[in-house]
Amino acid sequence: MKDKNEKKEKKNSAKAGKKGKLKRVELIFSAAVDEDFMDGFKKKGIGAHFTKISGVTGAGFSNPKLGDAVWPQLNEMIIVYCPKDEAEKIIELAEKIRDKYPMEGIACFVSKAAIR
């Protein structure tokens, strides 16, 4: 069953990409909430195909995450290319986690994408 769903998801993403309806969702968040995102993806059946970059440093609207002696925390970054409906579910998950952990620094950016 999983293989059929994966093939269907891949086909839908490819169709969306060729029609210019593919979305790029970028999530940047404190490493402390990584498990919340990964569990949320799994439970909601979203974000099955993603790129994850660990040890991301930066400063946004919460405390800096620089991985040094002064600001020792680090961020994670996840990039997902998906159809609009899946992007909306990822946004909902990010908002839910942000509400649960308002001081952790969780950013979500969505843009149009296309397969070339």
Label each residue range with its predicted role.
Residues 1-116:
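Positively charged, small/polar-rich N-terminal and surface patches that mediate targeting and assembly
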